[in-house]
Curated annotation (Swiss-Prot):
It comes from Bacillus pumilus (strain SAFR-032). GO terms for molecular function: 2-C-methyl-D-erythritol 4-phosphate cytidylyltransferase activity. This is 2-C-methyl-D-erythritol 4-phosphate cytidylyltransferase. The lineage of its organism: Bacteria, Bacillati, Bacillota, Bacilli, Bacillales. Keywords: Isoprene biosynthesis, Nucleotidyltransferase, Transferase. GO terms for biological process: isopentenyl diphosphate biosynthetic process, methylerythritol 4-phosphate pathway. SUPFAM superfamilies: Nucleotide-diphospho-sugar transferases (SSF53448). The gene is ispD.
């Protein structure tokens, strides 16, 4: 089954301290967002890639898309102030896909095998996310004091892509807009719907999100390892 992927790309990534949209930062002489788009462009089930962008950066994105040709159609829509609003605007641009993926533009290392499993899970169960078991000890802290050590066995660090039946994700965003709910990811919006469950597809620890300057060092190491440098 084919899918369309919505990629929120309007954020400025202040923690990266790059002074610009972090998706324009180059890894191995290619912008991060192009690395991410290439993954989906090469995936046979991807029908369309929708970028929710800052209108002020439209020309920058258009210029990149002209330089780097893709076989899969790419659509640009204006995003919102919050990530959730950007995804919603991208979702409105979905045309005829029964399955919709949402993916962080700053995660260029997602693998096709994980996308395959994720799409399969969304078809069968409605909603699924890529995640990895938490490796560190997690503690709840209040005003600098440890209040509780959380049992690690049931904790998973959720990544993207996240995949949903189009109808479910649309209903979740509409409900969030009506109620004013602001979630940290799209799965948290679906969790607000009565009777809807979200399922886990185990991912890979290399599927990092580029958030801080240190992440760029890790990203380069991952790329070197994958290319055998």
């Amino acid at each position: 089954m084919y899918y369309e992927v919505v990629i929120p790309a309007a954020g400025q990534g202040k923690r990266m301290k790059a002074g610009r949209n972090k998706l324009f930062i180059e890894l191995k002489r290619m912008p991060v967002i192009i690395h991410t788009l290439k993954v989906f462009d090469a995936h046979a089930q991807c029908k369309r890639m929708i970028l929710a962008i800052n209108e002020e950066e439209r020309q920058d994105f258009e210029r990149l898309l002209k330089v780097h040709a893709f076989q899969t159609p790419v659509s640009l829509v204006n995003g919102g102030e919050e990530r959730q609003q950007s995804v919603y605007e991208g979702l409105k641009a979905v045309k005829d896909a029964d399955i919709v993926l949402v993916h962080d533009g700053a995660r260029p290392f997602i693998k096709h095998t994980q996308i395959d499993l994720l799409v399969k899970a969304a078809i069968e169960k409605g909603s699924a996310v890529v995640a990895v078991p938490v490796k560190d000890t997690i503690k709840r802290v209040q005003e600098g004091k440890v209040e509780q050590t959380i049992e690690r066995q049931s904790l998973w660090a959720v990544q993207t892509p996240q995949a949903f039946r189009h109808s479910i994700l649309k209903e979740a965003h509409e409900y969030a807009e009506r109620t004013g709910f602001l979630g940290t990811d799209d799965a948290s919006l679906v969790e607000q719907l009565h009777g809807e469950n979200v399922y886990i597809v185990q991912g890979d620890y290399t599927n990092i999100k580029l958030t801080t300057p240190d992440d760029l060092l890790v990203a380069k190491a991952i790329m070197d390892a994958e290319r055998g440098y």
